[in-house]
């Protein structure tokens, strides 16, 4: 049987069995067999092997004999731990009524009692036992004490270094509690110095020092105010809780006992007012506790019970209600009128003088259908004025003065000195006009209101043509005034000079929204302020032939003026010998 159990244990738990046997044999020579086995090895075997009692008993029987089995059984089955940590034996329940040791052995499956004299008679100083080895109860009590010492070991004596560290830890804890404000100030100053180093650099300066002190004072004051606010809030909450507890009985007395005498009611009111005066936040806390449902029972403080104490407010007079209603209606009407005027001004800017739009102020622009209809009417009323014949022109239709009507009912033409700017700015009329529908007393070649603007977005006015007789005194800035013979007077004077011609300069844009340019193809009568001048033909320059520069050109170039376009002049310092040398 032993061989079978040994083979089983070696195959299943070979590692732990080997370690346990080696540790037992090594420790037995030093401390003694029984004491060390009970104190150290038995808990290891119980916790690490298995829950099956048979395996543990067999292992102990194979390794140490029957004595170990008895000690093991007495240790883990014969005692219980109490609350105070002391060991109390329960041998009576385990051994039976007679208390015979033979019953213990029979229950453990042991047929003979081993010789325990060696356990108590050992002369080993390290394993001195204080119990009788022949008494199983004494042996079990001793084993229980050893197990209790293992589970609850006595405090270990600290070394000098451990004691010093523990004392320092406690001392620092007390110092932090006593110097809490000082630590906060030091931490705040470190943060301020770090911020100042980023702003002013690491070098000391007066500005840096002043900023550090001001910032530290500001942050310190802010922290103190925050701490005071938190402290007052905590105190007020505690006071509110205490005062509410003392105020509720008085209010409940006033609400439930309406027939109480005046003395009782007066004392309750005084107590309630005193409590409210001590804590302003008490009303808010009371509102959270009051039940405003009058349908509930009057078992506590509710709205139904307070109606007996606080009388209802009298209703407002009828004339005051009527005046308030009239005021509200007048205010609403004024707001509607203001919105109507604002929408009219936003939709129809500058067209209030047109006859077709006189009825628009009587419309309600809050309706989208009315808005669309009025806008279409304004456009329709404007287009017939533009598309009329020459006898009924746009100038007479837009005039502020009464338009004269002839005998046959037709509208007379406008006077010759009529100005469009007197009626309306051109920017407001030009987007609505069609180029083909514009008719005026004057020629269409000189007044063309066209929607086809240049791609650059710049408008150009009709430019007066340059005349040789008028512009004879004018010179371009890059010509010398003393070269009047060889210098052309204008870019249009191409017949008298071989210099290249230039297109007319564009004038800067003006405040007119449409371009007006003279029609050069068909001569027609023009405005009175613009004389009818015929333009000479523009001669294209011959790019293949280079003009020969003269001495005057060299002189003007030497004086700092640039040469005429198309000419490149190079001269030498010794002009006496090589004065006529020209560069190709």
From Swiss-Prot:
Classification via InterPro entries: SPP41_DUF3020
Compositionally biased tracts (Low complexity): 231-243
CC terms in the record's Gene Ontology section: cytosol; nucleus
Compositional bias (Polar residues): 399-409, 433-453, 483-500, 511-531, 572-584
Compositional bias (Basic and acidic residues): 159-188
Region called Disordered, residue ranges: 151-188, 222-243, 399-418, 433-584
Protein name per UniProt: Uncharacterized protein C17D1.01
Organism, as annotated: Schizosaccharomyces pombe (strain 972 / ATCC 24843)
């Amino acid at each position: 049987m032993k061989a079978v159990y040994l083979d089983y244990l070696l195959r299943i738990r070979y590692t732990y069995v080997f370690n346990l046997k080696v540790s037992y044999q090594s420790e037995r020579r030093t401390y003694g067999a029984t004491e060390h086995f009970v104190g150290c090895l038995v808990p290891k075997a119980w916790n690490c092997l298995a829950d099956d009692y048979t395996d543990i008993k067999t292992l102990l029987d194979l390794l140490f004999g029957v004595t170990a089995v008895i000690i093991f059984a007495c240790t883990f089955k014969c005692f219980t731990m109490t609350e105070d940590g002391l060991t109390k034996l329960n041998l009576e329940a385990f051994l039976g009524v007679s208390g015979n040791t033979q019953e213990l052995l029979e229950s453990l499956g042991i047929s003979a009692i081993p010789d325990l004299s060696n356990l108590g008679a050992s002369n080993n100083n390290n394993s001195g036992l204080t119990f009788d080895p022949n008494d199983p109860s004494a042996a079990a009590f001793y084993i229980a004490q050893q197990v209790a010492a293992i589970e609850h070991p006595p405090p270990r004596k600290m070394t000098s270094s451990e004691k010093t560290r523990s004392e320092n830890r406690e001392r620092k804890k007390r110092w932090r509690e006593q110097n809490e404000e000082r630590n906060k100030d030091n931490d705040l100053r470190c943060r301020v110095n770090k911020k100042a180093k980023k702003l002013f650099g690491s070098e000391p300066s007066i500005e840096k020092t002043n900023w550090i002190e001001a910032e530290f004072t500001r942050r310190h004051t802010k922290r103190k105010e925050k701490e005071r606010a938190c402290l007052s809030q905590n105190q007020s909450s505690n006071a509110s809780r205490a005062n509410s507890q003392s105020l509720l009985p008085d209010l409940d007395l006033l609400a439930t006992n309406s027939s109480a005498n005046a003395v009782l009611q007066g004392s309750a009111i005084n107590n309630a007012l005193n409590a409210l005066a001590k804590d302003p936040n008490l009303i808010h806390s009371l509102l959270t506790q009051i039940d405003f449902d009058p349908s509930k029972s009057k078992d506590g403080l509710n709205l139904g019970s307070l109606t007996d104490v606080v009388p209802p407010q009298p209703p407002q007079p009828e004339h005051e209600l009527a005046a308030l209603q009239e005021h509200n209606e007048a205010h609403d009407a004024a707001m509607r009128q203001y919105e109507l005027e604002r929408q009219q001004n936003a939709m129809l800017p500058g067209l209030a003088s047109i006859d077709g739009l006189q009825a628009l102020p009587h419309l309600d622009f809050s309706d989208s259908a009315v808005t669309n209809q009025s806008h279409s009417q304004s456009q329709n009323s404007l287009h017939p004025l533009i598309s009329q014949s020459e006898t009924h022109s746009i100038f007479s239709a837009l005039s502020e003065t009464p338009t004269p009507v002839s005998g046959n009912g037709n509208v007379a033409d406008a006077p010759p000195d009529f100005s469009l700017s007197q009626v309306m700015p051109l920017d407001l009329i030009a987007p609505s006009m069609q180029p083909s529908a514009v008719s005026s007393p004057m020629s269409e070649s000189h007044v063309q209101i066209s929607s086809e603007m240049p791609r650059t977005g710049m408008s150009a006015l009709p430019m007066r043509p340059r005349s040789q007789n008028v512009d004879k005194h004018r010179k371009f800035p890059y010509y010398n005034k003393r070269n009047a013979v060889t210098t052309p007077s204008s870019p249009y004077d191409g017949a008298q000079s071989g210099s290249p011609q230039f297109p007319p300069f564009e004038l800067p844009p003006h405040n007119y929204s449409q371009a007006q340019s003279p029609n050069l193809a068909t001569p027609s009568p023009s405005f009175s302020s613009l004389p009818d001048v015929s333009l000479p033909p523009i001669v294209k320059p011959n790019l293949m032939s280079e003009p020969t520069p003269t001495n005057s050109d060299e002189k003007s170039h030497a004086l700092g003026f640039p040469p005429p376009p198309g000419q490149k002049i190079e001269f030498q310092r010794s002009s006496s010998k090589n004065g006529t040398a020209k560069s190709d």
